[in-house]
Amino acid sequence: MIPREVIEEIKEKVDIVEVISEYVNLTRVGSSYRALCPFHSETNPSFYVHPGLKIYHCFGCGASGDVIKFLQEMEGISFQEALERLAKRAGIDLSLYRTEGTSEYGKYIRLYEETWKRYVKELEKSKEAKDYLKSRGFSEEDIAKFGFGYVPKRSSISIEVAEGMNITLEELVRYGIALKKGDRFVDRFEGRIVVPIKNDSGHIVAFGGRALGNEEPKYLNSPETRYFSKKKTLFLFDEAKKVAKEVGFFVITEGYFDALAFRKDGIPTAVAVLGASLSREAILKLSAYSKNVILCFDNDKAGFRATLKSLEDLLDYEFNVLVATPSPYKDPDELFQKEGEGSLKKMLKNSRSFEYFLVTAGEVFFDRNSPAGVRSYLSFLKGWVQKMRRKGYLKHIENLVNEVSSSLQIPENQILNFFESDRSNTMPVHETKSSKVYDEGRGLAYLFLNYEDLREKILELDLEVLEDKNAREFFKRVSLGEDLNKVIENFPKELKDWIFETIESIPPPKDPEKFLGDLSEKLKIRRIERRIAEIDDMIKKASNDEERRLLLSMKVDLLRKIKRR
């Protein structure tokens, strides 16, 4: 059996527009493509292909589906045959999955399944582990229902299971279930309570672990493997998708204990992200079942950032988004533990449309007691307004303008004029001095964080000439080549705040490459200007006319270089 994740990977890698254009003549219309329908006779085109959603739809005959179904219908072939063709096109080898019992995938999921069964038995024997779960509000029935297990310290359970399956220790490490400590192999999750993480087909492909004491990290997920990708996996999605169409929405949370709290409170469509925020790959999964979501992340700055990042991508895919905040508690799990049954349902009923959250987030991240702070706050919101306008969220813009006007005590028409202006320095507040919303440092940091393919080029630039000390410190730290998320996690608060303000205050460039080129050019000019300043100092200190003439000549050459640029 071919796992759902692999099928989704094939659809992600294959360009649906490219495939369909081999059969019909597609014409671009906005963000979609249009053609005469290949499935029925018509004179006016009503067949549309949406590359962002990776689907096609005909408004005439109702034909619709993904790239696999299109190939099936056009060629009259089976699902398996269509998948084989597209897999070849995507460069994905399906031979690993053809016989589940003997394939590597089959071996992998059987290993996780058998190891999990042993972990469940260990939990039954551990009073400490059961007491911890009960302290978190889980009954005996909950513990069994959610599949909790426990891995004793210095455990070698997975090694014993692997030996019985003729799986080598090297494979065990590669599968992410064990690791080597010194000269011995141990279970990766030793000393932790674990919960199974399943793929879309309901097979266990990873574990989530929680330390019983104060050990760090407190939470630990399995590492990425060939069959487990954090950005492609949502905790509890395999169950939530079955009822999502009936319920009508998903609840997106930040951790598995939060998702389980929602389940205990009778919300069957709660899922948890396994990364910092909701990924685009996960959003595509959700869109197949419902385009209505309620975001409910932690009630702190990190949770707000995750909400903003998730919201940005959800709007790109034209979702209907509400935001719920577990105030005054830190997360949904704590709210449920403190307030009890019905508390999470009540919170969801009080959730508000995303534009109100944007206003609140801006108030949290920007100091609105100064003109500069108000500028940053409004620039942050302006970027969102531009996105909302492009996606047709016009009523939401109206709500946002009204909310900001009330908050800042500035007339709505002035707020709206600022949001619609081309230049961010037309501030609807009094300022004695104008300033740029961002400089080269912020611009380069924005590109570095959002465009992975540009990072190498950015690090090759003359970054020492950046005037912003935060920008210099940022690039000094990220240039070490370590995992970006881990590096940022260790940043001091001031630098983290600077990064967030940078991300949120700069609108996405239409052409990132050109934007980088412009910023690079500014750095070159800045380097020349520094050299000119150095020469001016040398001229003042020159001991004779000959030396002064030489220095002046050098200065003139540099000024010409600037002029030519």
UniProtKB/Swiss-Prot annotation:
Q: Which residues bind Mg(2+) 2 per the record?
A: D298, D300
Comment on bound cofactor:
Binds 1 zinc ion per monomer.
Q: Report domain Toprim positions.
A: 248-329
Keyword terms of this UniProt record = DNA replication, DNA-binding, DNA-directed RNA polymerase, Magnesium, Metal-binding, Nucleotidyltransferase, Primosome, Transcription, Transferase, Zinc, Zinc-finger
Can you quote a single GO CC term? Answer: DNA-directed RNA polymerase complex
SUPFAM superfamilies assigned to the protein according to its UniProt record, in alphabetical order: DNA primase core (SSF56731), Zinc beta-ribbon (SSF57783)
Give the enzyme's EC designation.
2.7.7.101
Q: Which cofactor does it need?
A: Zn(2+); Mg(2+)
Q: Where are the zinc fingers (CHC2-type)?
A: 37-61
PROSITE patterns found in the cross-reference section: TOPRIM
> Which CDD domains does the UniProt record give?
TOPRIM_DnaG_primases
The reaction(s) this protein catalyses: ssDNA + n NTP = ssDNA/pppN(pN)n-1 hybrid + (n-1) diphosphate
Entries under InterPro entries matching the protein: DNA_primase_core_N_sf (IPR037068), DNA_primase_DnaG (IPR006295), DNA_primase_Znf_CHC2 (IPR036977), DnaG_bac (IPR030846), DNAG_N (IPR013264), DnaG_primase (IPR050219), TOPRIM_DnaG_bac (IPR034151), TOPRIM_dom (IPR006171)
Known role: RNA polymerase that catalyzes the synthesis of short RNA molecules used as primers for DNA polymerase during DNA replication.
Q: What is annotated about its quaternary structure and interactions? A: Monomer. Interacts with DnaB.
Domain free text: Contains an N-terminal zinc-binding domain, a central core domain that contains the primase activity, and a C-terminal DnaB-binding domain.
- Name the UniProt record assigns to this protein: DNA primase
